């Protein structure tokens, strides 16, 4: 897990991916790494 995902921020998914070095996705309030 990388960081919390806040759905109110439009760039959150992008930040999640960047935090996971290109492989991350928001699942509910969590940013999980290892997903494209």
From Swiss-Prot:
One of its GO terms (molecular function) is toxin activity. Its main location: secreted. One of its GO terms (cellular component) is extracellular region. It is found in: Secreted. Belongs to the short scorpion toxin superfamily. Chloride channel inhibitor family. Toxin with unknown function in healthy organisms. On glioma cells, interacts with chloride channels (probably ClC-3/CLCN3) and MMP2 at the surface of glioma cells. This complex is then internalized via caveolae, thus inhibiting the chloride channels necessary for cell shrinkage and tumor propagation. Has been shown to weakly inhibit TRPV1 channels. This is Insectotoxin-I1. It comes from Mesobuthus eupeus (Lesser Asian scorpion).
